Amino acid sequence: MAELGAHRVAFIAGDGVGPEVAWAARRCVDASGARVEWTDVPAGQEAFGRTGDAFGAAAAAALSRLRLALKAPLESGTGGRGRNPNIVLRELLGVYAAVRHCRSYGGRGSPWEGMDVLVMMQENVSPLSAAGEEPAAETPARRFFDFAFGRAVAAGRRRVTVAHRAASAASVEGRWLRAAEEASRRFPGLSFEDQLAGHVAMQMARAPQRFDVILAA
C-alpha cells in the first residue's frame, strides 16, 4: 500500500553508466526527505535479454499508470537489439519537446559562471527525417514552437535563439525556420534571432552567457 501523500515514481535504472547514476540520484531523493514510493520498471538491455523487448508491455503499463519517472540512459537498440526504447517511450507518452535548464552555480571560478539558458528541442519529428513530407512536418513544428515560445514567456525569458542547419539543408530546415518565425510573431514580447547550429554550439562552449533560450531539433 502506498504511503499517504507519497509520490509514486517509476524507476528505470537504464544501461551503461545508467544504474550507477540513477541509484545515486534515487538515494539523493530519499535523503531529501521527499516521500516517494518507487516502482522498479524493467527496461533496457536487461529486459531485452529476458523478454526480447527493451521496453515491453509491463514497462509501458507502469509508465502509463504512474506518469512520473526517474529514468537513466537506455541503449539505442542498434545492432539488431530491437527497437530503440527511447523512441518507444517518447511515442508512448506523446513527448514532442525536451526541456533542459542549463545553469551554472557560483563559487567555482568557472569561465561559464552566469550561464542561465533554457534549451528546448523538438523530439517527435526531425526536420531532416521529414524531408518530402511538408504538410506532416509543419504541424509538429508549429506545435513545438508554440509550446517553446509559451514556455519562454512563462519562465520570464526575453530572447529566443533558433539553431538550424539551413545552410546544408535549405528546403527542409527552411520550412522549420519559417515555422519558428511565424511563432515569433505570435509572441511579440520576445526578441527573436536565428543562427546556424554550428555557431550556436561554438558560442555555447565559449560564452554561453549570451544565450537566454535556445530552440533546436
Regions found by a protein language model. Name each.
Residues 47, 77-78, 167-172, 202:
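Short, small-residue-enriched loops and turns at beta-alpha junctions
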Residues 4-8, 34, 64-68, 94-95, ...:
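Short coil/turn connectors at secondary-structure junctions
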Residues 35-58, 204:
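N-terminal beta-loop-helix "entrance" segment that forms/cooperates
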Residues 3-14, 39-44:
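Generic N-terminal amphipathic, Lys/Arg-enriched alpha-helix
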Residues 48-132:
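N-terminal glycine-rich phosphate/adenylate-binding segment common to multiple enzyme folds
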Residues 15-18, 67, 120, 148, ...:
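Buried hydrophobic positions in well-ordered alpha/beta secondary-structure cores of metabolic enzymes
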Residues 62-78, 190-217:
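Glycine-rich phosphate-binding loop
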Residues 9-31, 132-198:
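Glycine-rich phosphate/diphosphate-binding loop of Rossmann-like nucleotide-binding domains
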